[in-house]
Amino acid sequence: MLLLLATFTMQAQTATAIFSKTLSTFKAAGVVSAGYSMGSSKGTIVMNGSKFRVLANDLKAWYDGKTQWTYSKATGEVNVTSPSPQELVMVNPLAAAQSIKAAYNMSATKTSAFYLLKLTPKRKSNVKSITLYITKGGYQLSKAIYTTAKGSTTLKISNYKTHANYPASTFKFQKSLVPAGSEVVDLR
């Protein structure tokens, strides 16, 4: 029994170390750009610290560290908000990643190319588990599988580039990237 407990503790420490290394590698990468797909949604994301821009077929979002602009194809509107830290966790990949340690238990396994981190919620949640595929060579997220009672959803990351060159204006609303006539609704 003691050996089983020691193995579980070591596995959790290894998973936490891999997750921490992945997060620190991301933070040190400067401006990061990547493509992604999740179900029928495909797009690109550019991140610089807490700032981000997402351009997808059904959604566009910008966050400059203070103000968030979100365009929804379904409503044809751009909503302008000053999100709280809790709201940022829902849309900002870095904020979401930083909240994982507190909200999930972690375990790790290895394949030839990836560390697989299995995250299970510490409290009751709609999410049963999240499996993160972290590249062994670069500690970069390659894929995430979200499992709920209703099934699973896979997020795939492609064309991951670090130290990308994007101006500060990348993280502010760009009217030219939404259809002409889209209503801007200021909810601040």
Language model segments and positions:
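Short, hydrophobic/aromatic-rich segments at coil-to-beta transitions
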Residues: A29-G35, N48-V54, S112-K118, G138-K143
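Flexible, surface-exposed loop/linker segments and immediately adjacent secondary-structure boundaries
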Residues: P83-A113
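N-terminal leader/targeting segments and the immediate start of mature chains
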Residues: L4-K42, V46-K51, G76, F173-R188
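Short, surface-exposed charged micro-motifs
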Residues: T44, L59-K60, N105-S107, S129-Y133
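Gly/Pro-enriched, hydrophobic low-complexity segments
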Residues: T109-A180, V185
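An acidic-aromatic
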Residues: K42-V91, T148-T154
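Short, solvent-exposed secondary-structure boundary motifs
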Residues: Q13, A34-G39, N48-A56, N92-K101, ...
